[in-house]
């Protein structure tokens, strides 16, 4: 039996960004790769290296057909505002859980492995596929356990 698509409409995928930590600006990178970006806002807010490597590519090299980062949430609302402006994200939500029902999948682009299970848990429990960018546990012998996806998730 072939599993069904992970999202309702694979030709129109809505992604959410769930989090940012001070150690990395990957929410800017991921969002810019998917949505394109505002070079002025990006250079004002993201780490200089991000503007440098994004600027090395042509504007028409950004974007993924049928995919868009539509929502962002960050622990610090000011971070969410800056990422949204730099990466052309339409909607800022107040809580990570507010992404549920609004997006088809979430990106968790943080590198604090010890936080990943807690950050991913509400999405897994709701059947929203998370992409956790870094390993789930860098300070343990193995990853922190996540609950199994709900019955019927991804069908």
Pin down the residues of each PLM region:
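N-terminal glycine-/serine-/threonine-rich beta1-alpha1-beta2 phosphate-ribose binding loop
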Residues: 2-125
């Amino acid at each position: 039996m072939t599993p069904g698509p992970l999202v309702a409409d694979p030709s129109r995928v809505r992604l959410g960004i769930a989090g940012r930590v001070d150690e990395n600006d990957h929410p800017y990178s991921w969002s810019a790769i998917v949505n394109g970006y505002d070079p002025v806002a990006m250079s004002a807010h993201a780490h200089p290296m991000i503007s440098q490597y994004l600027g090395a590519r042509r504007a028409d090299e950004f974007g993924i057909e049928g995919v868009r980062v539509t929502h962002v949430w960050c622990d610090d609302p000011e971070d969410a505002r800056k990422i949204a402006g730099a990466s052309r994200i339409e909607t800022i939500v107040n809580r990570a859980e507010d992404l549920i029902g609004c997006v088809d999948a979430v990106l968790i682009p943080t590198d604090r492995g010890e936080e990943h299970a807690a950050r991913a848990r509400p999405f897994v429990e709701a059947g929203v596929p998370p992409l956790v960018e870094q390993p789930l546990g860098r300070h343990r012998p193995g990853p922190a356990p996540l609950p199994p996806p709900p019955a019927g998730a991804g069908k």
